[in-house]
Amino acid sequence: MNEGAATAVEREVASWTGVTTGDTGRGGLKLSYGKVELGHLHGDSFADLPFPKKARDELIEEERASVHPPLPNSGWMRRRMDGTGDAEAVIELFRMNYDRAKARAERSSSGADLRMNRYEG
C-alpha cells in the first residue's frame, strides 16, 4: 500500500522527541515542539512552515519552497507535495525547524538554570 505524503510526514515528524500534533482550526494538521509551531499540513497538497525571513528567502531562492500566498511578506513559506518523494523534502524542512526550536528551548532552559543557580548559594 502506498501511503500519502502527509501521512509519511506526520508519521516521521511526530516520532521526534517533544513533537505534538493538533488541529490548526482551519482543516490542517499542526506539528509543534512545545509551544512552537513547526508547520502544518494541508492534506497531501502542501505544507506551510514558518522560518526566519532570511532563511525563508534563501529556501525560496534555492527553489525548496515558494512564497506563502496568504502571508507573502512574512517568514511563512509553502512547499507543495505531489508525492512521497516530496514528503522527504518536507520532512527535511520540518527537521530544520525542529532543530532550531529545540536549540532555542535548550538555550532558554540553560539560561534559567544559570539564573536559578545564582540564587541558590
Residues of each region from the PLM?
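Charge-dense, helix-prone N-terminal extensions
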Residues: 1-121
